[in-house]
Amino acid sequence: MKRNSLSVENKIVQLSGAAKQPKVGFYSSLNQTHTHTVLLDWGSLPHHVVLQIFQYLPLLDRACASSVCRRWNEVFHISDLWRKFEFELNQSATSSFKSTHPDLIQQIIKKHFAHLQYVSFKVDSSAESAEAACDILSQLVNCSIQTLGLISTAKPSFMNVSESHFVSALTVVFINSKSLSSIKIEDTPVDDPSLKILVANNSDTLRLPKMSSCPHVSSDGILCVADRCQGLRELALNYYILTDELFLALSSETHVNLEHLRIDVVSENPGQIKFHAVKKHSWDALIKHSPRVNVVMHFFLYEEEFETFFKEETPVTHLYFGRSVSKVVLGRVGLNCPRLIELVVCANDLQPLDNELICIAEHCTNLTALGLSKCEVSCSAFIRFVRLCERRLTQLSVMEEVLIPDEDYSLDEIHTEVSKYLGRVWFPDVMPLW
């Protein structure tokens, strides 16, 4: 007997509905077998199954799938799928990302604004894109956003928007959300009055504010956020608005333990900013209150601007020097940064850092990561540094040209010695030829 084949095209399934019977002949067997033909109806899949499938699909694929049937279209508009959305806005045909289609933006405004909870805006370097982002922000009235991120992929384009337009749009979100927990508004014209509105409406929920490089925010504005938002766990800001009063506010008995503090120390022109010193008792109060806090400092200074830093014990854990840093400063780091976990030196004045590196290994006993580029260390000193740190040095990234051969070790020998102390194979990084 020739069986009917299953056809994918017409979505047919054959099911045998009879229990197995002893074979008593061809016709008897045929009579006791009931073949049912069922049409596979994808539209009959339960909502929760389709919803799970849709959650793994990119938006465009999800939109195409929603046209399969009415049920799938209903699932397409379920609120769970619209809680997180990134608006991408650009004006350039050569941009590295595609702009969100205007029709989709309008559909979200009409149907899904109330569902949005995790929202970000990614814009290119044009002021027009930032203006468009502000226009959308100003319409976020009937939604309760929990996280908000404003991301400029090139230069900070939000700084090219008029301050009044930006602040007005952002204030709409601050007033209507009531449950903001995380905001990333770095390189924007946000100001002190808008921060007061932020904490007035979201003080109980705000945990992770990132407000570095906001020139219109003063130390008073940051202090208002730290003082009123007792649940802050992370904070990112510029050094010039760091004050002793801020540290004391973050260290109050009612404030939760701070987990992450990122401080950007930036100068575009030498002498433009007079960097003040944070008092040791302020650092001590912070560490006593939050003993496990990661203090991350990014330095983009000229060498003559380091006079203020590292003269006293500083509880920094992650330290990045984006410009040239002198031997003297690195020597102070070794003596006064006992909590240091990670150190990255992008450049120095090409004086060998042998003594400074060994000092860091001896005094910074928590150090687990080191990155060196455009500086010089003798092979002997480098091997001694690695021997002092041994296997706790889990990340070691050093350009080959940093290592200077001496009478004890050549470049061909150094990887064997370093690998022995690290307990794993290690080679210096090499600049590719292309």
Curated annotation (Swiss-Prot):
Q: What stretches of residues are LRR repeats?
A: 158-187, 190-213, 214-239, 242-265, 322-347, 349-374, 375-400
Recorded metabolic or biological pathway in which this protein acts: Protein modification; protein ubiquitination
A Pfam family annotated for this chain is F-box-like
Instruction: Tell me which GO cellular component terms the UniProt record holds.
Output: cytosol; nucleus; SCF ubiquitin ligase complex; ubiquitin ligase complex
GO terms (molecular function) for this protein are:
ubiquitin-protein transferase activity
Identify the keywords attached in UniProt to this record, alphabetized. Answer: Biological rhythms, Cytoplasm, Leucine-rich repeat, Nucleus, Repeat, Ubl conjugation pathway
Q: Does the keyword ATP-binding apply?
A: no
Oligomer and partners: Interacts with CRY1 and CRY2. Part of the SCF (SKP1-CUL1-F-box) E3 ubiquitin-protein ligase complex SCF(FBXL21) composed of CUL1, SKP1, RBX1 and FBXL21.
| Name of the molecule in the record | Putative F-box/LRR-repeat protein 21
The organism named in the record is Homo sapiens
